[in-house]
Amino acid sequence: MSYSQTRTQSKAGYDAGVKDYKLTYYTPDYTPKDTDILAAFRMTPQPGVPPEEAGAAVAAESSTGTWTTVWTDLLTDLDRYKGRCYDIEAVANEDNQYIAYIAYPLDLFEEGSVVNLLTSLVGNVFGFKALRALRLEDIRIPVAYMKTFQGPPHGITVERDKINKYGRPLLGCTIKPKLGLSAKNYGRAVYECLRGGLDFTKDDENINSQPFMRWRDRFLFVAEAIHKAQAETGEIKGHYLNVTAATCEEMLKRAEFAKELEMPIIMHDFITGGFTANTTLSHWCRDNGVLLHIHRAMHAVIDRQKNHGMHFRVLSKCLRMSGGDHIHTGTVVGKLEGEKGITMGFVDLLRENYVEKDLSRGIYFTQDWASMGGVMAVASGGIHVWHMPALVEIFGDDSVLQFGGGTLGHPWGCAPGATANRVALEACVQARNEGRDMAREGGDILREAAKWSPELAVALEVWKEIKFEFEAMDTV
C-alpha cells in the first residue's frame, strides 16, 4: 500500500480513496481524558514510513480505521470513537524505534471483558505491513472501566484469612517429574512435601488428564494427602489442582469435584486456556469460596522479544482484571527470565492499589486499581535454599516461594527437602524482622540455622555451587 494520498469526490458526498492516517489519527494537541484507555506501543516502522504515520496507523487499525475511506463513516461520529496517537517519543539507544502513546475512548470496549479489550489493542494491527515490529509495552485502565471487572476471586487479605498464615511468604513446590507419575505415587509426593513444612504443592502446568494419570484419580489421591497432612501438622494445606481442560464445561466439572473434596485452591493455565475460560473460572471461585492459582504457560511466546509482542506487565494487568489469586512472575535469581527492576514493576502492579508512573521500571502510566484485590506473586523456577535470603528481601511477605527441584531434589527425600526450605524461610524472616542485612548476611543466617537443622545443612551442601547467571533480555 502506498502512503501517497489519493482522493476522489464521490457522488455520495465524501472524499473516496486512500489518505494518510496521520491526517485523522495523529493528534499531538490532544489531552487524554480520565476515562480514556491509554496504551504505549513500541513501534519499528518500515523504511520510509514516518513515525507520525506509523503511530496514526496503529491508532486507526486498533480502533475505527481501515485502509481506505468508506461512505459509512458518515453514519457515525468518528471524532467521538476514534483512537488518537497523541505523543511519540524516540527510544533511547535504539535505531528506528519509537514509543507511540495512544488514547482510546471508553465506549470502544465492552464492560468487564478482557477478551474484547485485547482483541482491539493487540488484534490485526500486529500484522500491519507498515510496521516491521510492534510491541504493547503498557496500558492505563481508567477507574471507570476498572470498576466493571470483578478482579481476583478473593485477593491477598482474604487468602491469608482462609489459610490462617501471616507475616511471612508462603512456601510451595511443583511435584516432579512433571509427567509420568501414577496418581497414587503423585499423592504420596504431595503428602511428603506438605507434612515436611510446605504450605502448598502444585500440579505442573502440563498436567491435565493424561493416560498415565486421569484427573479424577489425581484429585482423589491428592485430597487424601492433604487431609492427612493437615491432621498431622495442624496447619491448613493446599494443592493447586489444575482444572484446565479442553472446554469450559469440563473445566467447571473438575472445579466442582475439587470443591466436593474440600480442596481450598485450584489452578488454571490462563493464557493457553484463554481469558473467557479464566474469567468464567474466577467468577466460579468467588461464588464457591475456592482460591485460584494462575500459571502463565505460553507467556514467553508473547512477551520475550523486546521489539514485538506484548510485555508481561500488560498480561499481568489483564490477569488481575480477569481474576486470579496467585500468578507466576519469575524469580529474578532463578533459571527463568526476569530483571529485578522490571519484575518488581509488574509485581507491584499485581499487588498494590496505586502504582505511580516509573519509566525506570517500565511503568509508562500511573495506575489506580480502585481497591481491586491484589494478586500474590509466585516466584518459581530454579530456586533453592541459598536463594532464600534474596527471595525474602525481593518479594516480601505477599508472595509464594515455590521450590520444585529445590524440595524434591533433597538427598533425603521430599519431606526433608520441605523441612529445609521451611527452616531457611523462618530463619530469614526472623533475621529480616530483627533488622539484619539480608544481602550481606544471608549466607551466615542460613549457616547459623543449619546448625540446628540437619535437613538444611544437607541442602546447603548439595546446592552450594548452583547458579543461573545469564544476562536478562527484559530490560528498559
UniProtKB/Swiss-Prot annotation:
Mg(2+) binds at K202, D204, E205. The modification N6-carboxylysine is found at K202. Its EC number is 4.1.1.39. Binds 1 Mg(2+) ion per subunit. CDD domains: RuBisCO_large_I. It is an enzyme of class 4 (lyase). The disulfide bond which can form in the large chain dimeric partners within the hexadecamer appears to be associated with oxidative stress and protein turnover. The record marks K335 as: Transition state stabilizer. Its cofactor is Mg(2+). Keywords: Bacterial microcompartment, Calvin cycle, Carbon dioxide fixation, Carboxysome, Disulfide bond, Lyase, Magnesium, Metal-binding, Monooxygenase, Oxidoreductase, Photorespiration, Photosynthesis. The keyword Magnesium applies. InterPro entries: RuBisCO, RuBisCo_large_chain_AS, RuBisCO_lsu_C, RuBisCO_lsu_C_sf, RuBisCO_lsu_fd_N, RuBisCO_lsu_N_sf, RuBisCO_lsuI. Coiled coil: none annotated. It is found in: Carboxysome. Its main location: other. The active site is at K176 (proton acceptor), H295 (proton acceptor). Heterohexadecamer of 8 large chains and 8 small chains; disulfide-linked. The disulfide link is formed within the large subunit homodimers. Belongs to the RuBisCO large chain family. Type I subfamily. The basic functional RuBisCO is composed of a large chain homodimer in a 'head-to-tail' conformation. In form I RuBisCO this homodimer is arranged in a barrel-like tetramer with the small subunits forming a tetrameric 'cap' on each end of the 'barrel'. This is Ribulose bisphosphate carboxylase large chain. The gene is cbbL.
